[in-house]
Amino acid sequence: MNKQRTLSIIKPDAVEKNIIGEIYRRFEKSGLKVVAAKMKHLSKAEAEGFYAVHKDRPFFSALVEFMISGPVMIQVLEGDNAIAKNRKLMGATNPKEAEAGTIRADFADSIDANAVHGSDAPETAAQEIKYFFSDIEIVG
């Protein structure tokens, strides 16, 4: 057993489509437990800070603008191999390349409006969780 926590963000496009419950159902069906959650409309500074690792990439400005275009649902997921499990549920970054039945294949519109974000490694998961949640906000 490798119990982990990972950060997940349901992005503005998916929140707009009113599919938060469907995405949560997929988390829970795969054995992931939501141990913290909040809905938030990110400020530009929050989005820039969260995605600072990409600040020199050509897509940075568009990503920030997209992430502040509407509310997001941010959650901490916990479970065995939570990081890999969540990434498998999400599917490839580009929904056209995502396996059928993944969140992105089913709900994402484009590589930019791709429905969800998930941490990619234990180190980034820890940093991303701390960015949005204090220890007392996480149950379990």
From Swiss-Prot:
Main location: cytoplasm
Gene Ontology biological process terms from the UniProt entry: CTP biosynthetic process; GTP biosynthetic process; UTP biosynthetic process
GO MF annotations, alphabetized: ATP binding; metal ion binding; nucleoside diphosphate kinase activity
Catalysis: reaction(s): a 2'-deoxyribonucleoside 5'-diphosphate + ATP = a 2'-deoxyribonucleoside 5'-triphosphate + ADP; a ribonucleoside 5'-diphosphate + ATP = a ribonucleoside 5'-triphosphate + ADP
Cofactors (names): Mg(2+)
Superkingdom in the source lineage: Bacteria
SMART domains per record: NDK
UniProt keyword Mitochondrion, yes or no: no
GO CC terms: cytoplasm
Coiled coil regions, renumbered to chain: none
Location of the protein in the cell: Cytoplasm
EC number(s) stated in the UniProt entry for this protein: 2.7.4.6
Subunit note: Homotetramer.
Purpose of the protein: Major role in the synthesis of nucleoside triphosphates other than ATP. The ATP gamma phosphate is transferred to the NDP beta phosphate via a ping-pong mechanism, using a phosphorylated active-site intermediate.
PANTHER family membership: NUCLEOSIDE DIPHOSPHATE KINASE (PTHR46161), NUCLEOSIDE DIPHOSPHATE KINASE DDB_G0292928-RELATED (PTHR46161:SF3)
Descriptive protein name: Nucleoside diphosphate kinase
Highest classification ranks of the organism: Bacteria, Pseudomonadati, Pseudomonadota, Gammaproteobacteria, Thiotrichales
